[in-house]
Amino acid sequence: MKRYQAYKDSGVSWIGEIPVDWSIKKLKYYTTTNDEVLTENTAPNYEFRYVDIGSVTLQNGIEHYQGFSFEDAPSRARRIVRTGDVIVSTVRTYLKAVASIQDDKDVIASTGFAVIRPKEVDSRFLAYSLANHYFVETVSSRSVGVSYPAINASEMVDIKNVLPPNDVQKCIADYLDRKTAAVDTAISDKEKLIQLLEEQRTSIICSAVTKGIDATIKMKDSGVE
């Protein structure tokens, strides 16, 4: 169901029609990329939380960190991130490793990520738009290589994306924050229920194989603890 009075063709096949007051722009025109890196002059004892490609999923964002000091860290641990940035994998793009940075304290990302920094866009809207299935698939489809597909950051930010007016970006981000929080809560509740059911299942099996299914039968000591 259409929610706006007038639409126009976006000119991008995977986007289709968009409201007339929305824009289609290449990512590089409203963001910056890979702005900050650790240099070789970094103090050897500088300690940080490292994010590698394998630490990130599209569904959960950053799932875990690895602690390193600069002198012991992998050579690819170089990209400085800030709160509001979005990291998108440029190598092994089939893994769809995309995450927004919520806490930037001593966090360093792998050079296998492009660090996308909002410039003329709401940071939350940017995070949602780059985690969009169609954008992620576009990145993957433009990657080169079979066993180790990769895309240059400069090519990634050349991809066109939807850019609504600023007030609409905020409204969309607010809406998605509420909806995703509700879904996350529902998932958590379901997981707790599943755990309880699994415990009940285990208990039923244990009871049946050790005591039988007749609750009225007289029991005796087995002699086994």
Model-predicted regions and their roles:
Residues 40-48, 141-143, 219-222:
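Short coil/turn segments at secondary-structure boundaries
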Residues 6-10, 90-94, 106-113, 144-170:
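A short glycine-rich beta-alpha junction/loop motif
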Residues 76-136, 140, 150-152:
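A short beta-sheet element
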Residues 7-40, 158, 162, 166, ...:
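Non-catalytic DNA-recognition/assembly elements of restriction-modification systems
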Residues 10-11, 28-40, 51-83, 101:
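Sequence-specific dsDNA recognition surfaces
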Residues 20-27, 126, 157-192, 198:
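Amphipathic alpha-helical segments
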Residues 1-18, 181-225:
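Short amphipathic coiled-coil heptad-repeat segments
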